[in-house]
């Protein structure tokens, strides 16, 4: 077998290839069928609405009934109790290839001083035995033609820092830890070596599970990973599926039974599929843990350990994380062997220095007026294609703010855990494409949602800690761009003042004198249970809870502003 599988990938042709991209979890005719959408309100906002006449958001085989929390149960710690622990005998397991890297002559010719300078210039540190030198161009990475054609078609000028160092590491077959900020290009860092890995393995037989398994903390991130793998794997006819909770299992089960080379999954739904015999992990030889710190934050460690116990121990494992806390280090030491590590940027959690941070000390009653003033300034140039992500502390406040903004004529939509999956997908699409350039979100969106060109983040409510603050504002200023983060800080947040000032000082940002005063004099209050505006439901809000598509996202938009 050649190092890149030779003609292996071409023989993957036949058999139907990739059947339908990530959309195939939909069906026909379901979706959101109401006639609400944006059709009202003086011409409204983009006729047709959400579902309904004129297409709207595509089908869904009867719709996605259960909404968030249905079916998947990703947080149930007793998941996996029925999984049998595997006793692996490596002598009897089929052999497989995982080392494909051949150093390019240009890379081999560079002196250690040149390598060290490149790493310094890109804020890159490495650790471990025999770490390969970074590559500086796509051609130096040594990917086969069928991969490079896809990369060049995307128009990327050069590898990002994490790709420069991560590609040689992953292609070498070694276990890898990569620490880099969200938006650094890490998805491609493991996706492209995964495609090479798959094409060097025997074709799937009936009943085989996937060859590559990617675990992700949220369904939004899982879907985005799937989009990248679909894009770059199509020339190899690599099939994939995305397995996550909150939607019916039928389409996911059908994909798994037909056979997929790549499975992208959230931990809970994957265990559900394993326990029910819908798939197995016996063929997995390339395992990816994406946003490992976030998965541990969300309480998935027991599920991750159960899943890894179902995978042969001589697999290749790649772990990616934005931070490197002791919990992630423990997971790496338990499941990675002689791993090599690359860190981009400081190992300490710090804010992106390309982001201008504006922190305003306000009263709760001032928040809405101040938000509107900021929006007026940001959106006054309609040609600027600004995108604004507004974070709230609760789902209730997210819906109230969205309702308020839409009534005031702003193109705003909300996303949070109580929204049904197809509505969340639709909202994300509207935001990504700029059709609705304002998105209101809870922390479900603070990691894992990869929307490019977000120009502004507005923290309507301050989060529970400075780490979440850094991750929230990190949605802007990505891929070398600049961004602005505006934060409303109240006396209820005073316990967080010292940490916030530390973040601002490290990034050399202006500090509101009232914020500095909170640090000097301490201050009580703690965290308010509800971070948002109290008692102002906004005109026309009948009833106190979001009704999904009949809630704030379905309200006709006033035509006063937009």
Curated annotation (Swiss-Prot):
UniProt-annotated binding residues for ATP: 180-187
Ranges where the Helicase ATP-binding domain occurs: 167-342
Protein species of origin: Chaetomium globosum (strain ATCC 6205 / CBS 148.51 / DSM 1962 / NBRC 6347 / NRRL 1970) (Soil fungus)
InterPro entries documented for this protein: DEAD/DEAH_box_helicase_dom, Helicase_ATP-bd, Helicase_C-like, P-loop_NTPase, RNA-helicase_DEAD-box_CS, RNA_helicase_DEAD_Q_motif
Function per UniProt: ATP-dependent RNA helicase involved nonsense-mediated mRNA decay and ribosome biogenesis through rRNA processing.
Domain notes: The Q motif is unique to and characteristic of the DEAD box family of RNA helicases and controls ATP binding and hydrolysis.
Motif (Q motif): 136-164
Name the record gives this protein: ATP-dependent RNA helicase DBP2
Motif (DEAD box): 290-293
Oligomeric and partner information: Associates with polysomes.
One Pfam short name: Helicase_C
PROSITE patterns cross-referenced by the UniProt entry: DEAD_ATP_HELICASE, HELICASE_ATP_BIND_1, HELICASE_CTER, Q_MOTIF
Primary localisation category: cytoplasm
Domain of life: Eukaryota
Gene3D superfamilies from the UniProt entry: P-loop containing nucleotide triphosphate hydrolases
EC number of this enzyme: 3.6.4.13
Region (Disordered): 538-562
PANTHER family named among the record's database cross-references: ATP-DEPENDENT RNA HELICASE DBP3
Location in or out of the cell: Cytoplasm; Nucleus
A GO term for molecular function: RNA binding
Catalytic reactions on record: ATP + H2O = ADP + phosphate + H(+)
Entry keywords, A to Z: ATP-binding, Cytoplasm, Helicase, Hydrolase, Nonsense-mediated mRNA decay, Nucleotide-binding, Nucleus, Ribosome biogenesis, RNA-binding, rRNA processing
Cellular component GO terms held in the UniProt record: cytoplasm; nucleus
